Each structure stands twice: as C-alpha cells, then as structure tokens.
C-alpha cells in the first residue's frame, strides 16, 4: 500500500501536507531481504492506478521481482495516513483506507497457493488476514500443513483498527499455529490473546518450529525445536510425567509434546529513535535472512536487531 507521513507533528486534522512513501508488512520485508542480497518475489494485487504504479516501481527499485503483482481494474490501491509519533508517550494516529482495495480482493481463487509455494520461504502477515473474508480464506490455505509447501513465516502484526470484529483476532492464533516461523510481540500477544510472558505464548503456540517473541527495548527471545522420535512404550501402567519448561534466556532445553525447545534471548541495540515505522518488518527480514543463510539462533536475533536498528534511525 501507499503510505502518507506527515510533514510535521500534530493530529491529522492539523497536518497541512504529507510525504508519500511505500508501506505494507510483506513488501517491507521483501525490500529488506532483497537489499540483503536474497532473490525475492513479491506477490500481491494493486489497483490499475497511479498509486499502484508508484508502489510497484518503488518495490522493484530494491531489486524485488514484482512479476507476481496483479493489477485490479475495478479496485484502488490501498493507502494509509500516519501522524508523527509523540516521543514522550509513543502515541500516534493511524487511519487506513484499505476496505475495498485491490489487495482486499485476494483470495484462493485468484492467488492460487501452488503459485505461492515456488520459493524456499513464504512470508505472510496477519494484516492481510484482516482485510476481508477472502483474504482470510487465502491465509488459511497458505498456512495449511500440506505436503510440498515451503517454509512458512508468519508475522502476527495485530492491527486492531483493521479488524471488523474485535473477536476475530483469535484467528491470528490459528494462522500462527500453521506456520513454521512465527514473529509476535509480547504486547500484541497480551492485547490480542490475553497471553502474558514468553512461556505463556509458547504454551499457546507449540506447533511452530521457531517462535520469535519480540520484547521491544528488552530484546527478543526465540524458541527453536526439532521434533523428537516417538518413544518406545514403557511396559506396565504408570503415571505420566512432564518436564518443566526452560526459563527464557537460558539455553536449557524445554520438553513439550512437539519436541524439545532451545530458548535463546538477545538484547536489543540501544539507538536514538528517529522513526519507529517499519522496525518490526526490518527485524523479521534480518532474522529470516540469517535463517536462509543457516546461522544459529543467536545470530538470527542479532541480524534482526541490526536491521531494526537501521530502520529506527533512518
């Protein structure tokens, strides 16, 4: 989508002009990954309008393959407006104009899952699921655990302003359970699912092989696990037992029905924040870049922090 940022601080009613740029969680991640040297293809729908032209050209300028972007002659390109963040309160105003947009018309019928599974990694966002029922159906199809799909990455990206029914954010939990790599902030897990703390989030999301919990200035924690083979049955009856979970930040494995977790935490970098827009997407891109390069968990988190710091200070 096209993003409009204010020329000066203040409420939307008082801002006289805006600067046009590009936005969108998935396209942000695509641009950062391409800048990091990866081959990236962005697949979406935009309007057959000037904003769509600007969006496609701008994303392609980062080296992203935009051949998978479809033009919709009947629906416009989505836009949103954002006010400057108040550094004292971290408050800002966001207004979306995405209802009825070209992207909101994405569905399993016009965005075939098999066409999206051609790469090594498929990155998705919970924002898309909030745009329409068709988009939600597409997201359900893409997170279904079926043979032949690529590694699926899912950033929860809870945006209350986009959900028509506030209780609908529970579907984000279902979508996350279908992914292999999941990104979620502690704050959004609390707001969307009433889950507090890393252990509670992992308990609710045991399925993903990699769960990245973002903790703002405190850093990030990643749970990684490999499935364990089924144990041989013990002879005779006996009580079931379970091992305690690991404390986030330690390297002690934690047992679960899905295998054993290794938990690693890395603190965030200290930077002077200029603009917080896009930092979460940059973090995800940095983590995924390191994942594609086969780096260990701590290095993946460090790459995420480095990319996020670059976004925060530009």
Question: Where in the sequence are the language-model features?
Answer:
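Glycine-rich phosphate/adenosyl-contacting loop at the front of the ribokinase-like
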Residues: 1-65, 88, 272-273
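Alpha-helical segments flanking ligand/cofactor-binding loops in enzyme cores
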Residues: 31, 57, 144, 173, ...
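Conserved N-terminal subdomain of the carbohydrate kinase-like
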Residues: 39-126, 152
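Short beta-strand scaffold segments in enzyme catalytic cores
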Residues: 31, 79-83, 219-223
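Conserved beta-alpha-beta core of the PfkB/ribokinase-like small-molecule kinase fold
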Residues: 121, 127-201, 217-220, 225-228, ...
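Structural alpha-helical scaffold elements that stabilize or flank donor/cofactor-binding regions
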Residues: 114-115, 174-175, 204
């Amino acid at each position: 989508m096209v993003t409009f940022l204010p020329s000066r601080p203040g409420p939307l009613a008082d801002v006289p002009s805006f600067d046009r740029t590009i936005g969108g969680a998935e396209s942000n991640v695509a641009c950062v990954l391409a800048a990091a040297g990866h081959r990236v293809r962005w697949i979406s729908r935009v309007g057959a309008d000037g904003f769509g032209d600007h969006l496609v050209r701008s994303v392609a300028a980062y080296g992203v393959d935009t051949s998978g972007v479809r033009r919709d002659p009947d629906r416009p390109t989505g836009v949103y407006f954002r006010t400057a963040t108040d550094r004292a309160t971290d408050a800002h105003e966001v207004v979306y104009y995405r209802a009825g947009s070209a992207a909101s018309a994405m569905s399993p019928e016009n965005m075939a899952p098999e066409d999206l599974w051609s790469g090594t990694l498929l990155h998705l966002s919970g924002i898309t699921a909030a745009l329409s029922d068709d988009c939600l159906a597409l997201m359900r199809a893409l997170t279904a655990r079926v043979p032949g799909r690529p590694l699926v990455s899912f950033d929860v990206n809870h945006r209350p302003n986009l959900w028509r029914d506030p209780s609908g954010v529970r579907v984000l939990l279902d979508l996350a359970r279908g992914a292999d790599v999941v990104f979620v902030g502690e704050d959004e897990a609390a707001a969307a699912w009433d889950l507090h703390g890393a252990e509670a989030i992992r308990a609710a999301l045991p399925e993903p092989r990699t769960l990245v919990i973002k903790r703002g200035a405190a850093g990030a924690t990643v749970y990684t696990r490999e499935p364990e083979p089924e144990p041989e049955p013990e002879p005779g009856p006996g009580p079931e037992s379970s091992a305690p979970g690991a404390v986030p930040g330690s390297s002690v494995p934690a047992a679960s029905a899905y295998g054993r977790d290794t938990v690693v935490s890395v603190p965030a970098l200290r930077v002077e924040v200029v603009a917080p827009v896009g930092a979460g997407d940059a973090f995800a891109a940095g983590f995924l870049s390191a994942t594609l390069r086969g780096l260990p968990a701590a290095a993946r988190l460090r790459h995420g922090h480095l990319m996020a710091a670059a976004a925060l200070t530009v």
